[in-house]
């Protein structure tokens, strides 16, 4: 648990049930979130009010990068080609930091690193206030 942190799920559609039973607080925006002809407009509006987006390789990652939001992207060991290999940055999205699996299927190191970086990032934000 990290103090002074609110987590908001931008997930929609299939797979929403995967977040049931998690053991931490998470704000969900409901099954009608960003539905219909204007898909992704609501997502952009929410993102513009977030200090940081943490996501996997989904449309949300590309959207966050395209609108210039600070984004931390978690990637499997062998990612989609656009993320290249052996980089922690993206030439397409300068506000994005890449967190990569070292071993296939092992997310422990990735999320341990994110937890440490997030704690440091939040501490820096508090010092600026």
List the model feature ranges, each with a label.
Residues 1-129:
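Catalytic machinery of carbohydrate-active enzymes
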């Amino acid at each position: 648990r990290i103090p002074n942190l609110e987590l908001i799920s931008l997930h929609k559609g299939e797979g929403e049930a995967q977040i049931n039973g998690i053991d931490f607080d998470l704000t969900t925006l409901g099954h009608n979130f960003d539905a219909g002809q204007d898909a992704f407009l609501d997502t952009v509006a929410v993102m513009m009010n977030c200090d940081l987006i943490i996501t996997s390789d989904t449309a949300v990652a590309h959207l966050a990068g395209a609108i210039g939001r600070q984004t931390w992207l978690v990637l499997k060991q062998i990612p989609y080609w656009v993320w290249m290999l052996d980089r922690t940055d993206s030439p397409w999205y300068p506000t994005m930091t890449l967190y990569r699996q070292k071993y296939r299927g092992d997310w422990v190191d990735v999320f341990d690193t994110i937890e440490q970086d997030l704690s440091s990032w939040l501490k820096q934000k508090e010092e600026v206030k």
